[in-house]
A protein has these predicted regions:
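C-terminal amphipathic alpha-helical interaction region
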Residues: 90, 106-209
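Non-catalytic alpha-helical scaffold/packing segments enriched in small hydrophobic residues
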Residues: 80-83, 95-102, 116, 120-123, ...
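Glycine-rich, flexible loop segments associated with nucleotide phosphate handling
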Residues: 15-26, 174-179
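A glycine-rich phosphate-binding loop feature that marks nucleotide/adenosyl-phosphate handling sites
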Residues: 50, 58-62, 101-104, 136-144
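Gly/charged contiguous loops adjacent to phosphate- or pyrophosphate-bearing nucleotide/cofactor binding elements
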Residues: 6
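Short, charged/polar, low-complexity loop and linker segments
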Residues: 11-20, 130-137
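Alpha-helix capping/hinge segments and adjacent helical runs
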Residues: 20-98, 185-208
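Short, small-residue-biased leader/transition segments that mark boundaries at the very start
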Residues: 2-3
């Protein structure tokens, strides 16, 4: 949707805004999903135990292939550093804040957790941007920052799924509610964990690795 607007919107301002969102989200999406692919393939291998390494199953090849994607086109850690130090902090997160607000506009009056987590994210970004005492702190937080932003974007995507489903089929809630609940139960709690890690690091001026 955003990529389409970046190319085909009739409004130059909307095209420019969409292009900024694509630039910010590209390292997030690359890192988030290649890491998830590796972890998913590894989990499949673990289910089979030692037999998962037998070539005829093919899982061991998927594990290797998925691992390569975390290195290809810039390692995920470099992508995280690029996101935070080159795309977010130079303007203290102002562009990110503007873009997140635009994405949240369709959900005014609904999805309070999405809005609350966005506000908490902006406060964290401001805190990182105004830390002069540790020149390496932003580098150390970059991986958690990228992962946390990616999880927020996944939360946003689920809100769009819900909205589109109800527009197309008002009675079709069951079609998306189960996977959405699974996301809320198993995936979204990691966002809070990442926030806690970064907030503790900022409070103590060190990172627990």
């Amino acid at each position: 949707r955003v990529l389409f607007r970046s190319k085909h919107s009739a409004s130059p301002a909307e095209r420019a805004q969409a292009q900024r969102w694509c630039a910010l989200s590209t390292p997030v999406l690359k890192s988030l999903f290649t890491q998830q692919a590796f972890e998913g393939a590894s989990a499949c291998l673990q289910v089979l135990g030692g037999h998962g390494y037998v070539r005829e199953w093919g899982i061991e090849q998927h594990v290797r292939d998925a691992r390569v994607t975390m290195i290809y086109e810039g390692t995920n850690e470099i992508q995280a550093i690029d996101l935070l130090l080159r795309k977010v902090l130079p303007d203290a997160g102002a562009a990110l804040r503007e873009l997140m607000a635009a994405e949240l506009a369709p959900f005014q009056g609904s999805h309070p957790s999405l809005h609350d987590s966005a506000q908490e994210w902006h406060a964290l970004t401001q805190h990182i941007a105004t830390q002069p005492s540790s020149p390496t702190l932003a580098h150390e937080l970059a991986d958690d920052y990228l992962r946390g932003l990616g999880l927020w974007m996944m939360q946003l995507a689920w809100a769009h799924v819900e909205r589109a489903s109800l527009m197309l089929e008002p009675s079709g809630q069951a079609r998306w509610s189960d996977p959405q609940q699974a996301f809320q139960r198993w995936v979204w709690p990691e966002w809070r964990m990442r926030m806690n890690i970064m907030q503790d690091a900022l409070a103590n001026q060190k990172v627990s690795l």
